[in-house]
From Swiss-Prot:
Protein name (database record): tRNA pseudouridine synthase B
Active site: residue positions: D47 (nucleophile)
Encoding gene per record: truB
Extent of the signal sequence: none
EC class (word): isomerase
Pfam family membership, one: TruB_N
Length: 315
């Protein structure tokens, strides 16, 4: 007998403002529970120390979470100078203390080094896997394993302030960039060591900062629904962003209802102005209803790659 799914069918993206001190998975499970969603997934973990934007995909939106994982990110970070820790943040143990003594010119030179395309060796305290196990598990056992340097791109690195031994920076970077590693490397370049004491993700892709919602706000809305006999769809669903915002940067290909029937059954179709080697966003008819993403196949036809199940949301 087929297992019945639990929770309601609800599709969309929640821009969660994650609190400090909790794992991304804990935050994900809380959001899933509040919305009573049958399916949920996040789009790239934030460290427990970190706060800020954590897009949570519900329902069919989970099919496009990888595209947000691959998106550019922006962070506000404060580093404590003069102390290096084993995790490169304040959750770790202090392993070295040094005097803070550098000039503004030396700081400017060091910051310039990190701008643009560089290679970065990931921290041992990361979720990257080696032989099927996350690096942080090896690190906790005192085992260091080989890590390959990976290309990253820091599009912007802006100096915000230097107050005493606390340096605050604004960093706009590509996927896979470890801010803790930049902070640790910067501290070594300055000769004093450094570690992260505050990290806030302020942007993922082009999502607006003011659309974020906290777990506390969600909890209050659920309590309101209970107190006023309202449905979750009435109090929570207005917070959801459309699932196609995860692929809003893709070119739109609008097809007729007739062609859509073929596409939705997994068949490629002939369309005009189809870009080569690019994923496209597929919409249907005058209403431009989003149904998924596709790509040109070897025959020059639009082939579906990932399609959604069209259904009505539940209360």
């Amino acid at each position: 007998m087929a297992r019945r799914s639990r929770g309601r069918f609800i599709d969309g993206i929640v821009l969660l403002d994650k609190d400090t001190g909790m794992s991304s998975n804990f935050a994900l499970q809380r959001v899933k529970r509040f919305f009573n969603a049958n399916k949920a997934g996040h789009t790239g973990a934030l460290d427990p120390l970190a706060t800020g934007m954590l897009p949570i995909c519900l329902g069919e939106a989970t099919k496009f979470s990888q595209h947000l994982l691959d998106a550019d990110k922006r962070y506000l970070v404060t580093a404590k100078l003069g102390q290096r820790t084993d995790t490169s943040d304040s959750d770790g143990e202090i392993v070295q203390t040094r005097e803070v003594n550098f000039t503004q010119e030396q700081l400017d030179t060091a910051l310039e080094y990190f701008r643009g395309e560089t290679m970065q060796v990931p921290s041992m305290y990361s979720a990257l896997k080696y032989q099927g196990q996350p690096l942080y598990k090896y690190a906790r056992e005192g085992i260091e394993v080989p890590r390959e340097a990976r290309p990253i791109n820091v599009f912007e690195l802006n100096f915000i302030s230097l107050e005493g031994d606390e340096l605050t920076l604004d960093i706009h970077c590509s996927k896979g960039t470890y801010i803790r590693t930049i902070t640790d490397d910067l501290g070594e370049m300055l000769g004093c060591g450094a570690h992260v004491i505050m990290l806030r993700r302020t942007q993922v892709a082009g999502y607006p900062y003011d659309k974020m919602v906290s777990l506390k706000q969600l909890e209050e809305l659920v309590a309101k629904a209970d107190a006023e006999s309202l449905t979750l769809s009435e109090v929570l669903d207005p917070l959801l962003l459309p699932m196609d915002t995860a692929v809003s940067g893709f070119k739109e290909i609008n097809v007729s209802d007739e062609l859509a029937t073929y596409l939705m059954n997994g068949n490629p179709v002939q369309v005009a102005n189809l870009p080569v080697d690019e994923l496209v966003r597929i919409t249907i008819g005058d209403a431009r209803q989003f149904v998924g993403i596709g790509q040109m196949n070897d025959d020059g036809l639009l082939a579906p790659k990932r399609l959604i199940v069209l259904r009505e949301p539940q209360d």
